[in-house]
Amino acid sequence: ADNADAQYSPRYALLADQPGGPAILTGHQGGTITLNVAEADDVERARRRLALHEPYRTLLGHLRHESGHFYWERLVQQGGRLDAFRALFGDERRDYAAALSAHYADGPPPDWQEQHVSAYATAHPWEDWAETWAHYLHMVDLLETASAYDTALRVPGADGIVREQVANPFAHPAPPFDTLVRQWVPLTLLLNSLNRSLGQPDAYPFALSAGAWCKLRFVHDTVQQASSS
């Protein structure tokens, strides 16, 4: 049972920096997701976000990103989707350490938003997948919550703007991906507007391009394929 759990579910290690010891780095290796507990401190997390010029940094975001590395091995590498992955995200056999060093030295390309969900996603195909995976989890979680509260949105329809109930992405049968896309933009606009009404920053400070949506669709299709097998 333990081996089966390790195959399909990641393990977690919440560690803290110790005086004189090595720095604890958030990451994934060998099925274990390591998180530095300093990321749970609001002030420290904000400091790191500003230092790295990130628009969004949360503990939940870290968990979702690192789980993407875990599930890439199981759903893409072991799931027979490597060729399709490489056609869309690039070749993950590129030198990972060199790619990250180049990213931190030079930054993302100026047109990064055309094909990526975030600037960090440009660093390497593995990071592109993990960032896209995290955004997909953000999307389905927020849509599911909105659906549970019977939220209705005004969305474009065949005869103009129509009122539409938010779909539950975990319903059976699952709603089409295009439905999730159609509802995502107005839902995040609503969410951000509610935050601004209370003097808070945008909860979802991203604008996704058609290229980024193609990658999100790949994640969705990968999850649906695994769920039905």
Model-identified regions with their sequence ranges:
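Catalytic glutamate of the conserved HExxH
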Residues: 62-74
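Pan-zinc metallopeptidase signature
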Residues: 121-229
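Short pre-active-site segment immediately N-terminal to the catalytic Zn-binding motif
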Residues: 43-63
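Auxiliary, metal-adjacent structural segments of Zn-dependent hydrolase domains
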Residues: 1-42
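Post-HExxH zinc-binding segment in Zn-dependent metallohydrolases
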Residues: 72-143
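Active-site-adjacent bridging/hinge elements
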Residues: 35-46, 98-111, 162-166
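Active-site-proximal structural scaffolding
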Residues: 28, 56, 60-64, 123-126, ...
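Glycine- and acidic
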Residues: 48-54, 115, 172-177
